[in-house]
């Protein structure tokens, strides 16, 4: 199957792809991997894929106070799952709750898949109800394997749905927009994951616990960076006399081991040892575990062994092709691109994707590309390699129609971070390079707001003239702007002393015009922060302080509501040096602004609150209290 990978070669996949990137590598000393090719498949009565060694040994974890018991485990059968004493036949009241739980699971899946934003957001109300229902001990003891699996899968799916939807949006998520619930929705999701984890760790679901449920849970925890909690849950579970075997199944190991290695919970040699012990009797270990081991080997710099793992995946797919095995191949291929420090190897795998020369499909995920950009720049003295990878990635995403907004944002953010590191000073070469990069991007795809936002954010040259030229590109390329770009431009003026108060006020007015056209009826805190950074937090605060307080006095009642006013002043109470001046806006009825600020005619922006009334008590309390250290 894996032939003709190269257009001019008919060797195996290894000869056309793998051997080209082989370089002299010193493989860390470790026990050899299982390479058994016995024709007789081992009959393993252990349903959890655990090595039932007769040696009662303990594997002491690096940087951990606990020990993972890798001795023989009690074999679990379905009969045990059905007859465990924790299971209780539900009474009538519990049956009613159980049916409601089932209905909520169905409703949750329907709302999660809904294209309508309102329906999708209603999902989190359902999820919160499900999480609260699990607090009922009788209900927990009435759940079966299928229901627990459905619930864990719902949590797992919600994380991906939430992040995909948010990253695809063009709008900015302001936490002061109370009607924009994506922030609070994520709080609900995080809480549900932690609540479920606590119940699992307490042993509440032993009678219906499976490796798939555990995989979903651990992966969800890792997504939210609950790393310590997840690893502790796993380590404690391994040592559980009843369900320890579940924690050593391939799906679980594939989820845990990469993160454990990343966090230095285990050394590379210890990881290999765990793998060998749990796959010794298997001719072909599970493809997800092989993928995980390949990625760990890459991170450890053991590229020779990583290539061996890739070849094993190819062999396994060749014997029995499935979509899941293809996904594993793709995942490990991406790891060679983003995690490999040998740029020649990484480039080879990158080019195979760009040139579409693979017998399997690889979606070029941006985090791996940004990592590749970083590695390429760190490995060389110039930006040449990084430019090659960036240009080809931009063109690839455009050609394959993979134009998720966040994809370009992440890619461009990393690239221009590196660009201004490589060219910290403005000169003829750096200016020409930046101009050529902008031209390339505009010729490849329509120039967008996030692209210009990224350049302006990272712009570090001292020239105000060039910065103004960059800002003019929004109009030159007819870019559709949101309040985000206006905030970025306004904030950027704080880094340059050459901007006059009139110029800053003009940018503030442009910002308000955009808010008004975007049907905002209030000025969000994000805009107040941008004004602050452009004035009293600028490199010349003495020249711009009066402007800030004058604008604040003029537009103070344009905040969203009393809660927004209190939040705004609350931030200033933590900064005693500014508190007295801020207090004047609240306490002086006849405050005289030093700078004249004219209010244009708005269609949507309006006064919403009496700022002085909303903040008076907080200001008085803050002034009377002792300054915070």
From Swiss-Prot:
Residues 34-57 have a biased composition (Low complexity). It is a peripheral membrane protein. Its main location: mitochondrion. It is found in: Mitochondrion inner membrane. Phosphorylated. Phosphorylation promotes binding to RNA. Belongs to the RMD9 family. This is RNA-binding protein RMD9, mitochondrial. It comes from Scheffersomyces stipitis (strain ATCC 58785 / CBS 6054 / NBRC 10063 / NRRL Y-11545) (Yeast).
């Amino acid at each position: 199957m894996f032939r003709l990978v190269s257009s001019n070669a008919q060797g195996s996949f290894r000869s056309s792809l793998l051997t080209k990137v082989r370089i002299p590598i010193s493989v860390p000393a470790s026990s050899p991997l299982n390479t058994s090719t016995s024709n007789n498949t081992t009959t393993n009565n252990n349903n959890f894929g655990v090595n039932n060694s007769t040696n009662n040994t303990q594997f002491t974890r690096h940087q951990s106070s606990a020990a993972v018991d890798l001795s023989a485990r009690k074999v679990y059968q379905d009969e045990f799952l059905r007859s465990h004493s924790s299971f209780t036949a539900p009474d009538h009241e519990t049956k009613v709750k159980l049916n409601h739980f089932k209905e909520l699971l169905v409703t949750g899946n329907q709302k999660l898949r809904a294209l309508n934003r309102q329906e999708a957001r209603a999902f989190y109300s359902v999820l919160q109800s499900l999480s609260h229902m699990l607090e009922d001990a009788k209900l927990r003891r009435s759940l079966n394997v299928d229901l627990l699996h459905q619930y864990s899968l719902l949590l797992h799916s919600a994380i991906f749905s939430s992040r995909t939807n948010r990253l695809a949006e063009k709008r900015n998520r302001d936490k002061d927009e109370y009607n924009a619930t994506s922030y609070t929705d994520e709080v609900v999701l995080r809480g549900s994951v932690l609540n479920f984890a606590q119940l699992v760790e307490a042993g509440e679901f032993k009678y219906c616990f499976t490796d798939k449920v555990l995989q979903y849970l651990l992966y969800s925890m890792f997504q939210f960076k609950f790393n310590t909690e997840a690893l502790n849950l796993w380590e404690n579970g391994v040592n559980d006399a009843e369900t320890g075997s579940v924690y050593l199944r391939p799906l679980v190991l594939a989820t845990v081991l990469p993160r454990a290695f990343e966090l230095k919970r285990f050394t590379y040699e210890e990881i290999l040892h765990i793998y060998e012990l749990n796959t010794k009797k298997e001719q072909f270990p599970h493809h997800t575990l092989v993928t995980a081991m390949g990625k760990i080997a890459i991170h450890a710099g053991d590229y020779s062994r990583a290539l061996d793992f890739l070849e094993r995946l190819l062999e396994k797919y060749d014997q029995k092709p499935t979509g899941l095995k293809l996904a594993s191949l793709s995942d490990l291929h991406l790891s060679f691109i983003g995690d490999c420090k040998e740029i020649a190897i990484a480039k080879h795998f990158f080019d195979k994707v760009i040139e579409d020369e693979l017998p399997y499909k690889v979606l070029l995920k941006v985090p791996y590309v940004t990592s590749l950009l970083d590695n390429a720049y760190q490995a060389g003295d110039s930006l040449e390699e990084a430019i090659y990878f960036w240009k080809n990635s931009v063109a690839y995403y455009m050609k394959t129609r993979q134009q998720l907004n966040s994809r370009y944002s992440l890619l461009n953010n990393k690239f221009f971070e590196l660009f201004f590191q490589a060219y910290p000073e403005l000169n003829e070469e750096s200016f020409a390079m930046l101009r050529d990069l902008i031209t390339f991007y505009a010729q490849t795809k329509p120039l967008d707001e996030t692209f210009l936002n990224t350049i302006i954010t990272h712009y570090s040259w001292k020239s105000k003239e060039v910065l103004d030229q960059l800002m003019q590109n929004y109009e030159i390329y007819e870019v559709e702007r949101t309040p985000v770009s206006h905030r970025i431009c306004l904030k950027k003026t704080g880094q340059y002393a050459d901007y006059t108060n009139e110029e800053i006020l003009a940018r503030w007015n442009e910002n308000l015009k955009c808010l008004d056209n975007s049907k905002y009826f209030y000025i969000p805190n994000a805009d107040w922060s941008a004004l602050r950074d452009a004035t009293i937090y600028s490199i010349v605060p003495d020249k711009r302080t009066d402007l800030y307080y004058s604008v604040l006095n003029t537009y103070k009642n344009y905040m969203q509501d009393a809660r927004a006013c209190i939040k705004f002043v609350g931030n200033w109470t933590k900064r005693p040096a500014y508190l007295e001046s801020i207090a004047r806006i609240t306490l002086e009825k006849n405050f005289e602004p030093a700078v004249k600020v004219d209010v244009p005619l708005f269609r949507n922006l309006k006064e919403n609150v009496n700022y002085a009334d909303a903040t008076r008590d907080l200001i008085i309390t803050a002034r009377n209290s002792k300054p915070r250290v």
